[in-house]
């Protein structure tokens, strides 16, 4: 890299890393005023509309969205394709990926929600973007994420008592990606 480019790079880095302190019109530092909920400081978590919603409302909405996706999977008129192909005409990212995937329903009656959509890779290899054919020099692997679910905890039959629920994190395949 020649020296003008090096100098420009150094200047850009120094501007980016320089501490920024707000100043008032006289050039003095502003005092520590009351923190604004819209402008978080270095030790504050930004407050947005989502974080102001009560946690149970977000969980209900999350479960409703999962239920809608499961209903769409059950009611889908499209046959479950198990073919390794990319369809660039579709807007769904799982069908346009170089490691396409489909969804199946993961059912567990002791879980709330009992049904979760789970990704399954449609290819052993990955789709070559130049030939649009499966290339087995790479491998399609599922991408996992942890999702919150509620588990029903009921006492065993000799012990009477009501069932309880506990929120736990469950690992679910959410998509597929290519690896070498």
UniProtKB/Swiss-Prot annotation:
It is found in: Secreted. It comes from the Eukaryota. Residues 1-22 form the signal peptide. Keywords: Cytokine, Disulfide bond, Glycoprotein, Secreted, Signal. Its main location: secreted. Residues 23-32 have a biased composition (Basic residues). It holds the Pfam family IL17. The keyword Transport does not apply. Disulfide bonds join 121-176, 126-178. One of its GO terms (cellular component) is extracellular space. InterPro entries: Cystine-knot_cytokine, IL-17_chr, IL-17_fam. The keyword Secreted applies. GO terms for molecular function: cytokine activity; signaling receptor binding. One of its GO terms (biological process) is positive regulation of cytokine production involved in inflammatory response. Residues 22-44 are annotated as: Disordered. Glycans are attached at residue 75. Belongs to the IL-17 family. Stimulates the release of tumor necrosis factor alpha and IL-1-beta from the monocytic cell line THP-1. This is Interleukin-17B. The gene is Il17b.
């Amino acid at each position: 890299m020649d020296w003008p480019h090096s100098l420009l790079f150094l200047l850009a880095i120094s501007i980016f890393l320089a501490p920024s302190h707000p100043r008032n019109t006289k050039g003095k530092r502003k005092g520590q005023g009351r923190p604004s909920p819209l402008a978080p400081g270095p030790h504050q978590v930004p407050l947005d509309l989502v974080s102001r919603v009560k946690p149970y409302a977000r969980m209900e909405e999350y479960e409703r969205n999962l239920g809608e996706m499961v209903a769409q999977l059950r009611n889908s008129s499209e046959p479950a394709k198990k073919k390794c192909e990319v369809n660039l005409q579709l807007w769904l990212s799982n069908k346009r990926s170089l490691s396409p995937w489909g969804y199946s329903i993961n059912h567990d009656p002791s879980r709330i929600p009992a049904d979760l959509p789970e990704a399954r890779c449609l290819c052993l290899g990955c789709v070559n973007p130049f030939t649009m054919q499966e290339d087995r020099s790479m491998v399609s692997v599922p991408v996992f994420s942890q999702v919150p679910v509620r588990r029903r905890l009921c006492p065993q039959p000799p012990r009477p008592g009501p069932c309880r629920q506990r929120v736990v994190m469950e690992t679910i395949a959410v998509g597929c990606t290519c690896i070498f």
